[in-house]
Amino acid sequence: KKKTIPIGDWRHHGGSHNSDKYAPLDQITGSNFPQLEVVWRYRSPDLDLPEDLAYPTGDYRAVPLIVNGIMYVNSNHGLISALDSTTGEELWVFDPKSYELGPPLFSPLQTRGIEYWTDGEIERIFIATSGKQLVSVDIQTGQPDPNFGNNGYVDLKQNFGRLEFEMNNITHGAPPIAVGSTVIVGSKIYDFSMFNRSPP
C-alpha cells in the first residue's frame, strides 16, 4: 500500500520526481509575507573544517529536503545535516570527508544537492560527493548504510571508459536521482583550461 506523503514534504530537488517545484501550502500569502520573521538560523558545518581543507566554494544551489518534518540539507563541502524544521535543532551531521581528496581543478567546490529514497519502509539519503563517491545514508542515524555498496559507499571513479585524465576535473552538476532500485548520477568534465574570456 502506497503511503501518503505529508503536505509540505519536499523529498526531491525539484519537490517531486516531476520537478514541479510546488508545495500546496497556504500559511504564507502575499498579504502576510511582510510580517514574516526569522525563526532560526543554522551554522554550516563547513565553517568548522580545518583551514587547509576549507576550499573556495561556488554559489549555494542545493535545495533542503523535508521528510516528515525533518530537514535534510547538504553543505558545499558535502556534509549532510538533519535538522528539526520547527526549531532548527541539529539532529545529526554526516561527513563523508570527500574534501580530503582535493577540490575541483577548474571550478569552486560545490555540492548541488541530495536525494531521498524509500521503499516504503527503509529510508535513505543519497549524495554524490566531490570525491566521486555515491553514499547512502540512513536518515534515522545519519550513518552510511552497510547494505549499500562498500559499507555505504560506491566508488564512481570506475569504468569511465577513458584511461588517462585528471580525476579532479570531474564534478557533479546535479543531485542524484533515485527511482525504484536505480540511482542516477550525472557528471561533467572540464577537459580544457577555463578562463574568464573562454566561450560558453
Language-model features: where?
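Blade/loop signatures of beta-propeller domains
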Residues: 1-43
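Acidic, proline/glycine-rich low-complexity intrinsically disordered segments
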Residues: 10, 17-18, 44-46, 66-69, ...
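Repeat-blade elements of multi-bladed beta-propeller folds
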Residues: 10-14, 56-79, 106-133, 168-192
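A structural motif specific to WD40 beta-propellers
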Residues: 39, 89-93, 143-146, 155
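Extracytoplasmic beta-rich repeat domains
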Residues: 42-63, 93-119, 150-175
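Beta-propeller blade signature
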Residues: 137-142, 198-200
